[in-house]
Amino acid sequence: MATKKKKSLVPSFPPEPRPNPNLFVCTPMYGGMATGYYVQSLIQLPSTLQAHGCNMGYSAMFNESLIQRGRNALVHTFLPKKEFTHLMFIDADIKFNAADLVKMIQADKDIIAGIYPKKEINWGGVKAAVDRGEPVEDWKKRTGSLVINLKDYANTVTVPVDQPVEVNCAGTGFMLIKRETFEKMEPFVRKYKNDVGFIDGGIGAEEIIEYFACDIEPGTERLLSEDYYFCWRAREAGLKVWAAPWASLGHFGTYLFEGGLLPAP
């Protein structure tokens, strides 16, 4: 005779739906100055996010010459604002497409960054394009040296452009970070007492978590910039860093134009 299965007295509930992502955009803005390309891109962002059910907050850090301290202060501002699920660093010299950022949110990664060129011209890349006989209109694409350290792509820069790619390090100039990422990283980083003017204009004595710093990487003995340091600490915490190859970014900078008449052969 089959035994009747006892009914569980513990009520079951459907899983709670995940809240819509809400973005807190942070910009270190030395001198309080931003490029027109950044401003033009930023203006398009709120409406694009709202069309996808996302709200947006914003904070900028003026006149902080020490970039790692500026980024730490911006994270310190973000953390108590529990309504925001993601912090998005966008530097004031970056040109971006808001739709690319939406796709970065949808990728659902702990850390994902856009790939942008350094403020230098990769003349070697241009020469290689000329030697290969590439069309003149494509030479511009070869001028950039990218702010990225690829993982498992040591001998190639060919990656799938429509999906996230795992990297060792990426620049923080266009980086999306989940709130949970900071919580997971906290045991792996230090804290310090703030002794400078804070974002609201006051002098705060708050204890600030040092997610960003410059340090020497064990093993390689490389001096890490604040963004590569952040990625290193994230990997120590068991997290992965991803790049968004689909993000089309510009990095605005000044350039000294030089030239003159050449002597006759």
Regions found by a protein language model. Name each.
Residues E83-K95:
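Short beta-strand-to-loop acidic/aromatic patch adjacent to the donor-nucleotide binding site
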Residues A2-F24, P187-P265:
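C-terminal catalytic/acceptor-binding lobe
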Residues V75, N97-C214:
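Conserved catalytic core of nucleotide-sugar-dependent glycosyltransferases
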